[in-house]
Design a protein with these regions (language model features):
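Conserved active-site neighborhood of enzyme catalytic/cofactor-binding cores
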Residues: 297
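Beta-rich carbohydrate-recognition and catalytic domains
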Residues: 1-89, 97-160, 165-228, 236-291, ...
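Active-site/pore-lining binding-face segments in mid-to-C-terminal subdomains
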Residues: 232
Length: 328
């Protein structure tokens, strides 16, 4: 099995590379939940933009691979749903994967009812596209809901924040596994109840019907960097196994930091015995990331890894990047 890496992330001096937009625009109050793909010589950065009224929409920015800190905004690619829909107020946490000639955009919806906390995030929706830029909703209902695991059959809260991996089958077909966040918290003065989240996985043969949901990471009550929640599992394969960077909420900082885990099969994960798996912590006082660092998206660049993430206020200060040598 892989060992926990000693990542030496170097934060980019230009951070945040995608700050909130101009007053009155679709992302003037925040840029959050980055998900980055390389398409040819270009990076596509899908993210959640927050407008002045608090509506969240899926947006797109692009940059040349050779200039990974110089992004150009292209606006909204998926607007919120109708007033009574599960995604009537927020569309957040994009995850984009290509299935043959069709691009799938998975996103987390939040409805307009208030007072439910994490339970108002009632589904992961799907939109499709022929070019990865112009998307159309696949119906008006989520394709994944939060009540699919044996551990939490009455839960409603669910979020994306993960990845999709492809598994080749003996018959020549491809199956898919999605890593995502199970948001089981309920409104409470106890943050361990209010913000409780777990990491989960499911599988699919077509990217539409998902089954086999089960939890793969729980908060660790003895580890103060993640004794409240674990979320946003970004997973990739390496020779010898699987590696994950995920977010933890803990009493040490009160908000998100980032940690890592390793696995032989992508289902059973090793995190070490304490907080030895911490990989990125909040930045120095007064910085755009002094409060939290969260929602990792990792992409390989030759002999290094590039990490995209958001900062204070769940993206109120924008999106930044950091690089590190490939793990030995």
């Amino acid at each position: 099995m892989l060992n926990l890496a000693k990542f030496n992330w170097q934060r980019d001096p230009h951070n945040p590379i995608l700050p909130p937009g101009l007053a009155g625009t679709y992302d003037c109050r925040g840029c959050m939940n980055p998900f980055v793909l390389r398409v040819g010589s270009e990076y596509r950065l899908y993210y959640s933009g927050v407008d002045a009224d608090g509506y969240h929409r899926i947006c797109l920015a692009t940059a040349p691979v050779a200039e990974a800190t110089s992004f150009t905004r292209h606006g909204v690619v998926l607007d919120v749903g109708g007033a009574d829909d599960f995604d009537g107020r927020w569309c957040v946490v994009p995850l984009v994967h290509r299935f043959g000639d069709t691009w799938h955009l998975y996103y987390t919806g939040r409805h307009r009812r208030t007072g439910l906390g994490l339970q108002s995030f009632t589904g992961i929706g799907l939109a499709t596209s022929s070019d990865g830029i112009h998307f159309t909703r696949y119906g008006h209902n989520p394709v994944i809901t939060g009540d699919q695991t044996a551990e939490f059959p009455r839960n409603r809260g669910v979020a994306g924040g993960g990845t999709i991996l492809e598994d080749a089958q003996a018959d020549g077909t491809t199956h898919y596994r999605m890593y995502y966040t199970l948001a089981v918290g309920r409104p409470s003065d106890d943050v361990r109840v209010d913000q409780e989240k777990h990491c989960a996985v499911c599988r699919s043969a077509d990217g539409i019907g998902w089954k086999g949901h089960h939890v793969i990471l729980h908060p660790r009550r003895s580890v103060p960097s993640e004794d409240i929640a674990v979320a946003a599992p970004f997973v990739w394969r390496e020779p010898g196994g699987y590696r994950m960077i995920y977010c933890g909420i803990g009493t040490r900082w009160g908000y998100y930091s980032m940690s890592q885990a390793v696995s032989e099969d992508g289902y059973k994960w090793h995190r070490g015995d304490s907080d030895e798996n911490l990989t990125l912590t909040p930045g120095p006082a007064g910085s755009w990331e002094e409060q939290m660092v969260e929602y990792p998206s990792v992409i390989r660049e030759k002999d290094k890894l590039r990490l995209f993430y958001c900062g204070n206020g769940y993206g109120a200060t924008g999106i930044g990047t950091a690089t590190a040598p490939l793990p030995e």
